[in-house]
Design a protein with these regions (language model features):
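Short gly/ser/thr-rich secondary-structure transition/capping motifs
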Residues: 42-48, 102, 120-123, 221, ...
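ATP/adenylate-binding site constellation spanning eukaryotic-like Ser/Thr protein kinases
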Residues: 15, 33, 59, 78, ...
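Bacterial carbohydrate/catabolite-sensing allosteric modules
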Residues: 42, 83-88, 137-141, 145-328
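N-terminal helix-turn-helix DNA-binding module of bacterial transcription factors
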Residues: 1-59, 325-328
């Protein structure tokens, strides 16, 4: 592949002129510009993106770090971010941290070296964010709010209302023994959902019952077994997310339970799988696409010198499907 010096020689111009044509940083005589473009086309020359980024202090890259790309919530979130980035002339670089702080810091260092224009991140590590404050590029947190972090923008759903909505729906469906499969309580969104569950239980005089659970399908299978052993009279289950709701359904039906006649199940997120699965999962929907697009817009607005909203909270919505059934 030709170098910028070779392109300049073939076009009869200086390397600086070739650079100006590529970057559009200054006016170039049209005749010279056409000569340069013709040589670029003939030689297949491609500019070094990293070198350009280092020179311009911008790569038009938005970094995204998520804890588990296998979780459909995060893959759908990444899709929304990429689409919004592309529409605005940016590229997305996706990193998977596996909830590993060391990997988070390594990915942040890499993005900093690449002169990323911003970072959208899902993390529960205050230490990671503390390190971010020294890197100088804009950061948006998604889904998880960290303590003592006031300067970083966050985009999330109203998880507290989501917990209330899920619990109230099961009560309206006639459930009296409701078990909440609460997500990890070091994660703010999981804490808020469980708090919503607790408050509705108190309001309606329902006994609080819970199983600690993660967010994966495999964990859901294990925890569903634990739940049915610990709470044999359960008639309503709030799963930590839709994938766990699906694993709960599988476990219960294998044990001979009819859903929703014997036990009703509600998930959280409204991932695509929740309506492709049979029966379709009743869920509390997060506006995943809106969250991803908003996070991306904040990065771009920051880069363009605009003021940004630090706290961005989206409403959630009950989606009634086939794993719950109202009385009557």
């Amino acid at each position: 592949m030709a170098s910028i010096r070779e392109v300049a020689k073939l076009a009869g111009v200086s390397p600086a002129t070739v650079s100006r044509v590529i970057n559009g940083t200054a006016n170039v005589d049209d005749e010279k510009k056409q000569r340069v473009l013709k040589v670029i086309n003939e030689t297949g020359f491609r500019p070094n993106e990293l070198a350009r980024a280092l020179f311009k202090q911008s790569s038009k890259i938005i970094g995204v770090i998520v804890p588990n790309i296998e979780n459909p919530f995060f893959s759908e979130l990444a899709k929304a971010i990429e689409e919004e980035a592309y529409e605005n002339g940016y590229k997305m670089l996706l990193c998977n941290s596996n909830n590993n702080e060391e990997k988070e810091l390594m990915n942040i260092h890499m993005l900093n070296q690449l002169k990323a224009d911003g970072l959208i991140m899902v993390t529960d590590s205050n230490n990671t964010i503390k390190n971010l404050e020294d890197n100088g590029f804009p950061v948006v947190l998604v889904d998880r709010k960290l303590s003592k972090i006031n300067e970083i923008a966050i985009v999330e759903s109203d998880n507290y209302s989501g917990g209330k909505i899920a619990t109230k729906h099961l009560i309206e469906c006639g459930c009296k023994n409701i078990v909440c499969m609460k997500g990890p309580q070091n994660i703010s969104s999981a804490r808020q959902r469980y708090l919503g569950y607790q408050d509705i239980c108190k309001e309606y005089g329902i006994k609080e019952q819970y199983i600690e659970c993660g967010y994966s399908y495999d964990i859901g299978l294990i925890k569903a077994e634990e739940l049915i052993t610990k709470y044999p009279d359960v008639d309503g289950i709030i799963a930590s997310n839709d994938m766990v709701a699906i694993s709960v359904y599988k476990t219960l039906t294998q044990k001979g339970y009819n859903i929703p006649e014997d036990i009703q199940i509600i998930g959280f997120d409204n991932i695509k799988f929740s309506c492709l699965f049979t029966p379709e999962i009743t869920t509390v929907a997060q506006p995943i696409t809106k969250i991803g697009k908003k996070a991306t817009q904040i990065i771009i607005q920051y880069r363009d010198g605009h003021n940004i909203e630090r706290e961005n909270i989206f409403d959630v919505e009950l989606i009634e499907r086939q794993t719950t059934k109202r009385k009557g």
